């Protein structure tokens, strides 16, 4: 069975175990991501999306595409400009295509939440205030 998903402003035709490169998706290698914008599953066409359909995928790697050079030259003006751009891409492997609100066999990992809690715990501990020097001078003057 195949599905058409929408991510990064583009549409991709995917099937189970497909390996595709899409625009950057948040996550590290090994994370599970879910695509809820499923436009078509098999012969079922959504309007605009198929209700209850979900595609899960595993992030294989985060990479960058080839460099695209934007070169502009104004003839006879001694004026030119060169700029380069490398698009960030994510390689994903499609795990499952689910329909009718079925639950994925692997849950999407939420690793970022514990890291944020640990950072908040460290930030919540106030540092001890330095002793006031003005008070120390006042005591020595007496």
Swiss-Prot record:
Part of the 50S ribosomal subunit. Contacts protein L20. HAMAP family: Ribosomal_bL21. Keywords: Ribonucleoprotein, Ribosomal protein, RNA-binding, rRNA-binding. Transmembrane segments: none annotated. One of its GO terms (molecular function) is rRNA binding. PANTHER family: 50S RIBOSOMAL PROTEIN L21 (PTHR21349), LARGE RIBOSOMAL SUBUNIT PROTEIN BL21M (PTHR21349:SF0). The keyword RNA-binding applies. It holds the Pfam family Ribosomal_L21p. This is Large ribosomal subunit protein bL21. It comes from Brucella canis (strain ATCC 23365 / NCTC 10854 / RM-666).
């Amino acid at each position: 069975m195949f599905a058409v998903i929408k991510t990064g402003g583009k549409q991709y035709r995917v099937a189970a175990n497909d390996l595709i490169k899409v625009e950057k998706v948040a996550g590290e290698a090994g994370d599970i991501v879910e695509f809820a914008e499923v436009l078509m599953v098999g012969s079922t066409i959504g309007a605009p999306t198929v209700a209850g359909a979900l595609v899960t995928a595993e992030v294989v790697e985060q990479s960058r595409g080839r460099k695209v050079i934007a070169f502009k030259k104004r003839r006879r003006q001694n004026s030119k400009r060169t700029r380069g751009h490398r698009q960030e891409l994510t390689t994903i492997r499609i795990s499952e295509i689910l329909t009718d609100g079925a639950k994925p066999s692997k849950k999407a990992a939420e690793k970022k939440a514990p890291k944020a809690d640990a950072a908040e715990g460290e930030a919540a501990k106030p540092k001890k205030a330095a002793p006031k020097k003005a008070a120390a001078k006042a005591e020595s003057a007496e």
